[in-house]
Amino acid sequence: MITTLKNEAPRAHMPSGVSDPLASKISWQPLVNGGTGGRGCKLIKVGDAKVEFRSTHAFILLPTMLLLAGLPVIWAGVRSPLSQGIGPLILGLLSFCVGAIYLYFQTTRSVFDKQSGIFTKTRRSLNASGNLERAPQKVNLSDIHALQLLAKSLRSRGSSGFKCYELNLVFENAGRINIANHGNLQLIREDAANLAAFLGKPIWDAIV
């Protein structure tokens, strides 16, 4: 589950091996707010001309359980006499709503379709300021200039913190869109390499 945590990462810098002029114009700071310690999404090959990032089953397990757990409690609350109070109904609604909200934001898909020549992100994420990204997130694949890998340290009150990594798309106009944000460095680098090969674009890796 994505948790909104304090970002304690030092200011990132452009990798020394990158000489592309656009690299000096883009931001090298984390793009999204929070993150997860485990693998939140993975790159899936849908066909010869399409790949997409999907949330992992483990990542959506908890919100799904919250949503499903709320249903029988809501039903019991509706059927119970008013004299017994509305506590169960409120509890069920709360569990259902929290699960539904988390599930909505955690079932993001980032689709790269060579046949249509379009990249589409089906959900908006929270940016580094805690606000929703602008919509719609649909751009031409030809506008993608490079892939950017960043690291950040996340910490919450009473937590020792953990490392989280971002994979972002970089566009010709110096804009960025996040497509992966989790704590498994090896797997996010593997996904970045596979996506770079699919798109024929370079990877700008600022993770040290």
Label each residue range with its predicted role:
Residues 184-208:
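Cytosol-/stroma-facing membrane-proximal "stalk/adaptor" domains immediately downstream
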Residues 62-66, 130-134, 189-191:
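A short, polar/proline- and glycine-enriched secondary-structure boundary/capping micro-motif
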Residues 6, 33-35, 120-187, 206-207:
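Non-transmembrane, membrane-adjacent beta-strand/coil modules in membrane-associated proteins
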Residues 43-44, 53, 99-143:
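Conserved beta-hairpin
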Residues 51-53, 69-72, 110-112, 119, ...:
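Short, structured motif recognition centered on aromatic/hydrophobic residues
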Residues 2-48:
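Short, charged cytosolic
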Residues 48-111, 177:
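Alpha-helical transmembrane spans
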Residues 38-54, 113, 155-161:
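Short, ordered beta-strand-loop transition motifs
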